[in-house]
């Protein structure tokens, strides 16, 4: 009972054409209501494809009864070099807006999606964006963040991708350009409200453990229902 992926496009609030895929669960009944899981890809320079994926098994994720939404947000590959570079200087805000807009359109066009039960999650850059959603919206009932940064500044100082961070964020951290100030999720900690599962590998050198610990500390300090899972590798 493997449903096909349903493709759709929309024009974002910034005038960009955004590609998406929707997947229904096994035993799908269009007369019923299903929770929506917004699955966020990492990278950001990669893309969701209509194919079998070993790392992310679409049908396995949908099996508990979720409708899955996959959005190729700004910065995704496969749509030309210019499209991939739109995330430079705007690493989180626009991509986050596009994820929310995609969910709005999926809910509008498919009556079987329960708008009151939305979840979002991802790993690596997908975790970064899940954390940005924590900072900017309360629409999701829960969030899942694997190896996601919560603090641009400490991520710059401990990750192995310092140069790439500077390109995306408009310069080194000490110059304190607008991205460092305005698109750093931890600066919005007072607004955090959404229950969250935080996971990370203890030996992750791309998004080191410290960022997950910072996030966990904020969630606990804010008394937000949350769990931290650290893998020993």
Where are the language model's segments positioned?
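Active-site-proximal cap/loop segments of hydrolase catalytic domains
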Residues: 62-63, 70-233
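Exposed loop/turn and edge beta-strand positions of beta-sandwich/beta-sheet ligand-binding modules
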Residues: 4-6, 16, 34, 114, ...
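Short strand->helix junction
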Residues: 27, 45-47, 89, 205-206
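Short hydrophobic segments within beta-strands
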Residues: 23, 39-40, 121, 199
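Short substrate-entry loop that stabilizes the transition state in hydrolases
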Residues: 28-34, 39-80, 152
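Non-catalytic accessory segments flanking enzyme active sites
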Residues: 1-32, 49, 56-58, 63, ...
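Generic low-complexity segments that are intrinsically disordered, proline-rich and/or Lys/Arg-biased
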Residues: 26-27, 36, 45, 143, ...
């Amino acid at each position: 009972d493997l449903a096909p992926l349903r493709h759709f496009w929309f024009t974002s609030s910034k005038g960009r054409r955004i590609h998406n895929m929707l997947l229904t669960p096994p035993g799908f009944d269009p007369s019923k209501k299903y929770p929506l899981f917004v699955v966020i890809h990492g990278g950001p320079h990669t893309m969701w494809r209509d194919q079998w994926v070993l790392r992310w098994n679409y049908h396995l994720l949908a099996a508990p009864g979720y409708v899955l939404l996959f959005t190729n947000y700004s910065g995704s590959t496969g749509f030309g070099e210019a499209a991939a570079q739109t995330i430079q200087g705007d690493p989180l805000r626009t991509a986050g807006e596009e994820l929310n807009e995609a969910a709005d359109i999926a809910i509008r066009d498919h009556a079987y999606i329960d708008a009151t039960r939305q979840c979002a999650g991802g790993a690596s850059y997908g975790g970064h964006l899940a954390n940005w959603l924590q900072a900017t919206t309360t629409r999701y009932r829960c969030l899942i963040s694997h190896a996601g940064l919560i603090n641009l500044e400490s991520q710059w100082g401990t990750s192995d991708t310092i140069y790439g961070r500077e390109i995306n964020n408009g310069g080194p951290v000490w110059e304190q350009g607008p991205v460092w100030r305005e698109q750093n999720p931890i600066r919005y900690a007072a607004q955090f409200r959404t229950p969250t599962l935080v996971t990370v590998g203890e030996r992750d050198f791309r998004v080191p453990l410290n960022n997950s610990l910072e996030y966990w500390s904020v969630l606990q300090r804010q008394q937000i229902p949350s769990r931290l899972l650290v893998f020993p590798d």
